[in-house]
Regions:
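A domain-level signal for the structural core that forms small-molecule/cofactor-binding pockets
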Residues: 2-132
Length: 132
């Protein structure tokens, strides 16, 4: 009998859970707010938005095709303020952090591959394991 990933006797499944205010959560909230803003004005938009952050800096990037003008910096600062990062002496503040935006239109290839029945053409969750 061959052993599979799921039948391995030494299988250890782990996951990470972060709490409110963690940079991963803040970045997710910024991306969600950007999507909400766009879809609220342009339901036919195509959005692939990624957000990352470090001390004093937020970077918004991706491929977004929409007819709606988006104030990416304003949305990011509002989310950061709403989360509670309001004092620069704490290492991060909505007023003093840098916000870099690098967004371009979605590529024609991805846009052509995504139809009304399929909302995402290049998204997935990967699960793997190491072996010798």
């Amino acid at each position: 009998m061959t052993m599979t990933f799921m039948s391995s006797p030494s299988l250890l499944m782990t996951s990470e859970s972060v709490t409110e205010g963690h940079p991963d959560k803040v970045c997710d909230q910024i991306a969600d707010a950007i999507l909400d803003e766009i879809i609220g004005h342009d339901p036919d938009a195509h959005v692939a938005c990624e957000v990352t952050a470090t001390t004093g800096l937020v970077v918004i990037m991706g491929e977004i095709s929409t007819a709606h003008h988006v104030d990416y910096t304003g949305i990011a600062r509002q989310v950061i303020r709403d989360v509670g990062y309001t004092k620069s002496e704490h290492g991060f503040s909505f007023e003093s952090c840098g916000v870099v935006v690098s967004v371009k239109e979605q590529s024609r290839e991805i846009a052509a591959a995504v139809g009304a029945d399929e909302g995402a053409g290049d998204q997935g969750i990967m699960l793997g394991f190491a072996c010798n």
